[in-house]
Amino acid sequence: MGTELLLGNILNTNARYLSRELADLGITVQRESTIGDNQGRLADFVNEAKARCDLLVFTGGLGPTADDLTKETVAACYGDTLAFDEEEWAKITSYFARSGRETTPNNRKQAMVPVHGRKIVNHHGTAPGAWFEQDGRCAVLMPGVPSEMKAMWTESIRPLLLERQNCTLHSITLRVL
């Protein structure tokens, strides 16, 4: 997620990493898309994609700025709302204090978590992830910062997906000369 990816300002290494990780779980990646910071286009994309896919995986757009629209948009598309989480806010303010900075009012946005979905704790930054589910279809939201995304994937998302699987696909590559 993010206009900065569409402009070529940032290389999307998250897509490559997640494609490999999902394949390792036996989950077929049908499409990889980059959506700019536009709520209408994002909502259209989510509604279209969730109609044909069991799992949507998002990275980015969970920050405190006005153009970080992923969480509220996906929540609405999955029939959920967000609520302020005092525990998450305390974690965010503590994170800032440890780095010698103060929070600003826009940082409160990151303490908004799903009412019906699941908050995914971010142990390596200030943007919690989220898990939304509707009619057996899921959306997973992770931070766009690669190190935070990879940690959240390993610590939380991958285990959640493994719990949901009823089989495991193992693949090997044979090189024939």
Question: Which residues make up each language-model segment?
Answer:
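Glycine-rich phosphate-binding loop
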Residues: 51-77
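Glycine-rich phosphate/diphosphate-binding loop of Rossmann-like nucleotide-binding domains
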Residues: 1-33
